[in-house]
Amino acid sequence: MNYMRDSNPAYHIPVLLSEAMDGLKLRASGVFVDCTFGGGGHSTEILAHLNSEGRVYGFDQDGDAKRNVLQDDRFVFIPHNFRHIRRFLRLHGVTAVDGILADLGVSSHQFDEPTRGFSTRSEDASLDMRMDKRQSLTAESVLNTYGEQKLQEMFSMYGEVTNAKTLAKAIVTLRNKTPFRTVRGFKQTIADLVKGNPNRYFAQVFQALRIEVNDETGALREMLTQVPDLLKPGGRIVIISFHSLEDRIVKQFFRYGRFEAKDEQDPFGSFPSITPFRTITKKPITPSEKELNRNPRARSAKLRIAEKI
């Protein structure tokens, strides 16, 4: 089935739209959560398949997303991080839902807005990278205050930077001479440390900074732990990720109901815990060539689906 409809491509092009709608197993009178509202593309599609009793609750911590709020009585916008999903749904009187969707990572708007500092091309921008401008931690503060070991772990885990240790050590040394303030200044200062393709290298470094600043993996874990209590039996959760670490977290949680694959231990030996989900996608769904031609940024997207038992 083709669910593609108009959204706000100037803000964000929804990725794997048809696949996400199919994965949610939409029910006309159902209650659904869009954890990453953004440009409203996914929420708009969900609403198109609901009747007057259906509801969509859209979360987004980025204040810029408010401009895209849908004028529909069946839609409620919640301007907060999805890590607080249960708390804010309960404030709206919602204790159980039929489906949850999350399109992780940075939006096209955030990436393309030069003042936000997400892109390596925004060289005049300050080192900000906050998805939620209400928080205090920025990329600038990370680079200028984190210790060498913490920086190394960040670049290695979140960016898979090959020379993470060397980079971290250099940053601590160089910032004592001149603190990092802008994208251009940071790139110029570490230019001699680049390994391989410069564009790819800086993209990996900036990805690591962004994930750290916004605690993206922490937020994902917190949200996932609340899902079993929120989803109705037979309800679906659909997660679209763009980073291997995020995908591993989602895969593990869908399969085991926790973030470690090891069996729990009791005094008499090990025993497997009972997962609250049935995994629908044994392998992740990836974009078609047609979608990639239309939206090259979707290339690393992976979609996984699980159903509440």
PLM segments and residue spans:
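S-adenosyl-L-methionine-dependent methyltransferase catalytic core, i.e., the SAM/SAH-binding region
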Residues: 1-309
